[in-house]
Curated annotation (Swiss-Prot):
GO terms for molecular function: rRNA binding; structural constituent of ribosome. GO terms for biological process: translation. The lineage of its organism: Bacteria, Bacillati, Cyanobacteriota, Cyanophyceae, Synechococcales. Pfam families: Ribosomal_L23. Part of the 50S ribosomal subunit. Contacts protein L29, and trigger factor when it is bound to the ribosome. Belongs to the universal ribosomal protein uL23 family. It comes from Prochlorococcus marinus (strain AS9601). This is Large ribosomal subunit protein uL23. One of the early assembly proteins it binds 23S rRNA. One of the proteins that surrounds the polypeptide exit tunnel on the outside of the ribosome. Forms the main docking site for trigger factor binding to the ribosome. Keywords: Ribonucleoprotein, Ribosomal protein, RNA-binding, rRNA-binding. The keyword Plastid does not apply. One of its GO terms (cellular component) is ribosome.
């Protein structure tokens, strides 16, 4: 990998998605992240493996259309969001929630 690619790995993953559906998928060893909309599946896989030291089996992505927001008479668009569902190898785990 080139140094440019290595430096962008941390910028690929924005934040984990915490919804009921994403939380239920944790039982299947699948983690959902919001990622940069320009990121490709190999980049997402490399970023997760490098940042969390786990083995990624597969990556599914979804790129829904931008939503229009309206405030008074002004209309605008929300920022582009791309989600990635990452499936990990058996036995690997990512600590998303702090343990109490």
């Amino acid at each position: 990998m080139s140094k440019l690619f290595d430096s962008r790995l941390a910028d690929v993953i924005r934040k984990p998605v915490i919804t009921e559906k994403a939380t239920n998928a944790l039982d299947l060893n699948q983690y959902t992240f919001e990622v940069d909309h320009r990121a490709a599946k190999p980049q997402i896989k490399a970023a997760v493996e490098a940042l969390f030291s786990v083995k990624v089996i597969g990556v599914n992505t979804m790129n829904p259309p931008r939503r229009t927001r309206r405030v008074g008479k002004f209309s605008g668009k929300r920022s582009q969001v791309k989600k990635a569902i990452v499936r990990l190898a058996e036995g690997d785990k990512i600590q998303l929630f702090p343990e109490s």
